[in-house]
Amino acid sequence: SLSSAISPSSYAAIAAAYSARTPIFNKKKTAAVLSPLSLFHQSPSLSKTGIFLHRGRKESSSKFYIAASVTTAVPSLDDSVEKVHLPRGAMWSIHKFGGTCVGSSERIRNVAEIVVEDDSERKLVVVSAMSKVTDMMYDLIYKAQSRDDSYESALDAVMEKHKLTAFDLLDEDDLARFLTRLQHDVITLKAMLRAIYIAGHATESFSDFVVGHGELWSAQLLSFVIRKNGGDCNWMDTRDVLVVNPAGSNQVDPDYLESEKRLEKWFSSNQCQTIVATGFIASTPQNIPTTLKRDGSDFSAAIMGALLRAGQVTIWTDVNGVYSADPRKVSEAVVLKTLSYQEAWEMSYFGANVLHPRTINPVMRYDIPIVIRNIFNLSAPGTMICRESVGETEDGLKLESHVKGFATIDNLALINVEGTGMAGVPGTATAIFGAVKDVGANVIMISQASSEHSICFAVPESEVKAVAKALEARFRQALDAGRLSQVANNPNCSILATVGQKMASTPGVSATLFNALAKANINVRAIAQGCTEYNITVVLSREDCVRALKAVHSRFYLSRTTIAVGIVGPGLIGATLLDQLRDQAAILKENSKIDLRVMGITGSRTMLLSETGIDLSRWREVQKEKGQTAGLEKFVQHVRGNHFIPSTVIVDCTADSEVASHYHDWLCRGIHVITPNKKANSGPLDQYLKLRALQRRSYTHYFYEATVVAGLPIITTLQGLLETGDKILRIEGIFSGTLSYIFNNFKSTTPFSEVVSEAKAAGYTEPDPRDDLAGTDVARKVIILARGSGLKLELSDIPVQSLVPEPLRGIASAEEFLLQLPQFDSDMTRKREDAENAGEVLRYVGVVDAVNQKGVVELKRYKKEHPFAQLSGSDNINAFTTERYNKQPPIIRGPGAGAEVTAGGVFSDILRLASYLGAPS
């Protein structure tokens, strides 16, 4: 009913507006009238005979009420019309087109073409109002009850929208018929809105009656166009057929038996091959117009499918189907080929844009499949929702886990009721959720410890204060007595649901899920899983929700291991690494399911960023064209957070101590670090120890194999020996490729200075050869190995024998140094000759003496048959003397310098990281 207190003087306005029993709605099979009704103090009950306003004074008073109701006249069949049996079964194809699909004349033509081209024997088409019209109709009601005079012009705008569409679509006769009906409807609506304006209030039945006109008009327009295209078509006002009963707030239950009877009657008078039915609207058993509430048009299509036992219900939208995750949050979400009814229900409950759960119920009764398709991409097959789903990806590969999709709900709070007094006490849960019910809150998820010590549940954040207050009041005595320890609420939470019908029969799904979350450094606050195992639900921090969604989706839907890579320092080693990644990327993805995405490359001046992955075949050109000013923090934030990949690694290919100083922070943020940069591991001991301790207690990894001898597996061998219980006694090796080359070529015919110049010309030395000859680089490698062996040494604790003559250490330029170096050849020649006379050679080595807790870098003599004397070129060599390998130390030998092998060592660390993150070994 529509009721509002008005004064007697206001009645003149009503009487002027409405004459006694004036018809205000005259349309096929629907009647409504306004008539004076008695005015009285008590709000009257709903009239069942039409829309009436009755006037009459019950007693003297300054306040009166207007009462009105809306009813739909149910069509009665003429006895002379022979009853026709309504065929049911798979010959019926149901289509539903939303407001976007019929948003313009061109789109209505497109819909009509789709319907006509459907070769089904019989078709029923459910349509929504044109795009934005439903909102416009609600706005009319809001303006009218707010006594905003602009409601009339707003209604004229709605009429004009439909008139222009009709002019574009219809021929003369059809146009005249439609415009006549439209004009009658608008007159009716103006009268009703005027009544709402005067009363200052609109009841639900009045609102439903007004809003439903959008569907009436779009259905008529589409039916005219289908007939124009040669289709045998009638339109149906579903208020004449669908009967629903209110079922609580914002819900209705279909009355299938009564609806079937009315559908039979309607079809007897309207036999046709194609029916265009209004979505969203229906009637109550008292014939009062109502709506099907949220997602009502989808619900209409599902109900009609059930009434007709249709072969299929197709929901036409503006997306290609149901996605494995929200594509706005996960850019690589895929369209699912199939979903089971249960999977679709679970995903929609947890916020996925699939269907409202109630839409699925009618079709489930008769195993009618629902297909979600894109009207703007007819080539896309869409998603089929049916009894059984198929666990396939787009390329036909079976999903190992049978997980179909992921959905999230944000803006939740987690309430925890905890206490030892809960255990074994019957009725505790009833009391808790009774208090929640009393404040009208909605519980989204429940989790209870098996010890009965605590119950936690999630509610909308907007309701958490009321719930917490109600619980504290309900359990005040238990809290004061200590039987309950707390009623705590944790705001800023989100729910992540993992859905799949076949998860119950697939071992390891939960393990895979939580492993993915752990490796993305995400903390889970609560867990819930039903015995059917259709979904696994976790509660986590809202700020982690999108990252968690990306992490689990990546684990189940992308390559087995997908890693975001950020390259710092695209110099000689960095550029070579990028080339190696480019050449190997496709092979790794195909054979090992490892997907390495370079999301950013930064130098000291410019950086190149990408949302989906840089094309490594032309990164140099793109960086020149689109590079932006370098900023290390912005670079890291982008690589870490601006994409769909959960695991991130920063590869530092510089020799910069400033970059190395960020490693600890990156590891704290869940970013893995790989580097050939020696500065962090050979820097201050306390910083090194903090770095190593952080790595051990977190799920982040710090790999630095290439810091000692490029790509040779020195670090991993050392760690393997220690982890298996061996004890390091001594590590000795030639760790400089430059100095290895120099002493391998320092023979009787060539002075030392000449060999140094040759090494520089060949690219083996640093721009200033003194950086190599000073031995500092070797000392850094020795300190890295010493610390890796458990020795707590500083770089200053390592004595280093410099090969740079004392007088030449202060010379400004490298060129001047090389010019003066020959003056000191005699000293090196004498050392070489002394060694040769003893059957030995000179080698520049680093030594870790673990027994005596020290290290040294020095020029040392070795017998010619010693492995260290057998080197050639720039090879490096290392020998581990341990308790197990004491008499015959294992030796690792190979190239120890050069961009290719150093980049290869870094690449090997990246693949080791991928293996740790789940890639097959």
Swiss-Prot record:
A sodium ion is seen in the structure; a metal ion may subtly affect the relative position of the nucleotide-binding region to influence enzyme activity, and could increase the stability of the enzyme. Its EC number is 2.7.2.4, 1.1.1.3. In the N-terminal section; belongs to the aspartokinase family. NADPH binds at residues 573, 654, 678, 898. NCBIfam families: asp_kinases (TIGR00657), PRK09436.1 (NF006959), PRK09466.1 (NF007003). One of its GO terms (biological process) is methionine biosynthetic process. It comes from Daucus carota (Wild carrot). Keywords: Amino-acid biosynthesis, ATP-binding, Chloroplast, Kinase, Lysine biosynthesis, Metal-binding, Methionine biosynthesis, Multifunctional enzyme, NAD, NADP, Nucleotide-binding, Oxidoreductase, Plastid, Repeat, Sodium, Threonine biosynthesis, Transferase, Transit peptide. This is Bifunctional aspartokinase/homoserine dehydrogenase, chloroplastic. Gene3D superfamilies: Acetylglutamate kinase-like (3.40.1160.10), Dihydrodipicolinate Reductase, domain 2 (3.30.360.10), NAD(P)-binding Rossmann-like Domain (3.40.50.720), VC0802-like (3.30.2130.10). Residues 1-87 form a transit peptide. Signal peptide: none annotated. Residues 88-339 are annotated as: Aspartokinase. Na(+) binds at residues 705, 708, 710, 712. It is found in: Plastid, Chloroplast. It comes from the Eukaryota. SUPFAM superfamilies: ACT-like (SSF55021), Carbamate kinase-like (SSF53633), Glyceraldehyde-3-phosphate dehydrogenase-like, C-terminal domain (SSF55347), NAD(P)-binding Rossmann-fold domains (SSF51735). Its cofactor is a metal cation.
